[in-house]
Curated annotation (Swiss-Prot):
Organism lineage: Eukaryota, Fungi, Dikarya, Ascomycota, Saccharomycotina
Pfam families: TLD
Task of the protein: May be involved in protection from oxidative damage.
Superkingdom as given in the UniProt entry: Eukaryota
Annotated ranges, domain TLDc: 61-250
Gene name of the record: OXR1
Protein name as it appears in the record: Oxidation resistance protein 1
Keyword tags: Mitochondrion
Family to which the UniProt record says this protein belongs: Belongs to the OXR1 family.
GO cellular component: mitochondrion; nucleus
BP terms from Gene Ontology: response to oxidative stress
Cellular location(s): Mitochondrion
Length: 250
């Protein structure tokens, strides 16, 4: 457990102020377990991320470089150093099918390397959330969970900028992207569980932290013991999927 505590402390280094009331009505206890990022000092800046794989015709792109910079701060140090993020699966580019998602990841030539994987989901209300996995998502024949303590869940939303602006500057964007990450708690080992009919991350007390169906049409999200997460979707515990992407980091 000491290693886990050290990891949680390292996640908190250099973080901005926690805006406990900015997203929903989460309790202070849940907020204290979550990790939020606003910006970092220039001395801590990593080389910029390069996104590879979007088609020129892809209109609904879920991931931006700004979001990548926030997400990479939660990843293991060796993964943070990678600058290339490669799109392996996109609902818009490859079709709405969990089988297609698994198939695209199955033939990833780097799936045996020390890389990471990010799943990004958008719901009908514009909420963007997902998870990070230390290994590729793949179905298992038996009820077997995989993944390790590097896995986490996350959600990202636009929140009000608390800095005071001149009243004449009302036309400028007064919102910032803010990430809330939910790291591995050590309470159980239910990081990732995938079958031919669903993909999930986190579990406990009969609920999944994140679960999506084989048609990539619907999903559910509940607080889980694995990650101590809040409900991830803006729609609530049950959500409709608008977009899904899976990226390889490294």
């Amino acid at each position: 457990m000491s290693g886990f505590r050290n990891r949680i402390q390292s996640w908190g280094k250099g973080l901005g102020t926690v805006l406990s009331d900015s997203i929903g009505d989460e309790s202070s206890e849940k907020t204290s377990r979550s990790i939020q990022h606003n910006h970092y000092e220039e001395d801590d800046a990593l080389p910029p991320v390069h996104l590879i794989g979007y088609s020129e015709k892809t209109k609904n792109r879920l991931l931006s470089k700004e979001m990548c910079e926030e997400l990479r701060q939660l990843m293991p140090t060796r993964i943070q150093l990678y600058t290339e993020w490669t799109l392996l699966y996109s609902l818009e580019q490859h079709g709405a099918s969990l089988h297609s998602l698994y198939d695209k990841l199955k033939y990833d030539t780097n799936n045996n390397a020390r890389v990471g994987y990010v799943i990004v989901i958008r719901d009908r209300k514009g909420g963007i959330f997902g998870g990070y996995a230390n290994e590729t998502f793949h179905p298992t024949d038996s009820r077997r969970y995989y993944g390790n303590g590097e896995c986490f869940l996350w959600k990202m939303e636009k929140v009000p900028d608390l800095q005071l602006h001149d009243k004449h500057d009302c036309k400028q964007d007064s919102h910032n992207w803010q990430l809330r990450g939910f790291p591995y708690t050590g309470e159980n080992e239910f990081s990732i569980y995938c079958t031919s009919t669903f993909l999930s991350m986190g579990a406990g007390d009969g609920h999944y932290g994140l679960w999506i169906d084989d048609g990539l049409f619907r999903g559910v999200t509940f607080p889980s013991m694995t990650f101590g997460n809040d409900i991830l979707s803006r729609e609530g515990s049950k959500f409709h999927i608008v977009g899904v992407e899976v990226w390889r980091v490294g």
